[in-house]
Amino acid sequence: MIAHWYVHWQNIDSSWSRLFDQHNEHRIALPRLIFFTDLGWFRGSWYFTLGCLFLIQLLHAMLLTKLICSALSCHAISRLMVGGIVVALMFSALQIRNLVWGLQVQFLGVFFIGTVALYFLLRSGTTSQTSHSVWKSPFLVGAFSCVAATFTMANGLLLWVVGMMFGIKNTWSVKRLLVFWTLASLVWVVYFADFQFDPALPRPWDTIHQLWPVVQYMAVYLGNPISPAWRECAIVLGLLGMISTLLLSLSFTFDRAHRIFNSHALRTLLAIVVFVLLTALITALGRIEFGVEQAMASRYATPALIFWIATCALLLSIRVKSRLILLGIRQIGAVITLSVIFSALTFQLKIPEIEQQFRLTRLAAAASLLSNVYDKSVLEHIHPRPPQIMSVVDTLREHRLSLFSMEIADLIGQSLEQSLSITPRDQCAGHIDQVTDLASDRNGFRLRGWAIDRTRDKPADQIIFVSEGLIRGVAFSGVERKDVEKHYPGIKRSGWFGYARVNPGVTVQAYALIHDNQSACLLNGRYRR
């Protein structure tokens, strides 16, 4: 995570002046404050950033629950049920990347701040309320939340559009509309001052003519969380959601007496749905060149789930005169609600598998970076442009940031005998099983094997590689080895995966770290390059 943005901000003290600098198409000033805090106080360890991720999602779930319970007029037991469902969806494994990757704090943040903005902007719904002073109402909280969302992620700009549309329909006073429009204009001017489009991405207006592919992208974007394994079904569900939003918006537009959308909660939920739909549109226009498959990325599950939570709440709570139409709306809402819940619960069963895959991917990337070996195929899983990571590794190592704050990072390049005590070989078991040269690094190679700490009857968590008396690389255990488990019952994940950097003609040996990583125990097998 740190490497993803640290390329341009290698000195915290000099970075404040660049807080609003462009990052791709975004200006992520608020997320950078979180990153700087993590970097300065927690040495880039992720703890603070991931804590913020959890808190943002929890607060968002609580606010959505409040809106839904208000719209449905829920009692105490019903509130608990609604809250449980919303929390389960907001922390669903469908959006796993957003919940475990620190950089995604901006992705979760913009939708939470957007909900807060719309909640306060639309809180004044009657003519008498709108006559109140602009400076003494929740309006200001909503307006400045729009500013915060804008400088969290680019789609925050859409809140000004949504806010203006709903403000006009909500009969804001001329004074309030003027203040909001002025602030919106100022923010847009500041945002696009010295703005540069990424040459690798199409301009949104250049892809408008691709109407059907854009619609398909939007449909997959919205429908994928309900049908993650069947794209055609996801398209149908996404189209259903888009049509529902269109019909609800038309009903809201012509509902002059507020008979259908008769509460602040209903209007806010509709505004949230429109905001997410516009986000899907802008995303489709900017990403359609990558193909419709790109809309299935797990990061998009967060706005899609918010979309369905709000849509289902609307379908289950709005009131119309025709009993037949009302029954149809309720049935559609119930079916979609059950489908979303079923999909989320089904996907939760995959959490152990997903967690293990993420863990191994990160450990492999950490081993590559700690060993100073460039394995492009592994680093692509944690960063879209692996060379950028290698360009900041020396800086991260020098300042002991992120993974270089780990104790094992200090061992690389050090003498084995001076850094660790050597224990008898009967205190461990293991072997180097496979060594693979890397096309992306001439002097680096990948090693696989297994290791067991016999003093504790458990896998040895960390392994080091030694040549010519110096520690040249590291590996981490966690790979399931059923063949080893046959000989050591109960020890499942003794397999390790790591890297070493050595010159041709030297021999490499592997040592398991035991005794709280204070001692090294030689494993069987050696490799001569």
How would you describe each model-predicted region?
Residues 158-189:
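Perimembrane helix-loop-helix junctions
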Residues 81-89, 181-189, 260-287:
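Transmembrane alpha-helix segments characteristic
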Residues 85, 106-129, 160, 307-310:
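Specific aromatic-rich, kink-prone transmembrane helix
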Residues 38, 69, 91-101, 191-199, ...:
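Juxtamembrane "helix-exit" motif on the non-cytosolic side of transmembrane helices
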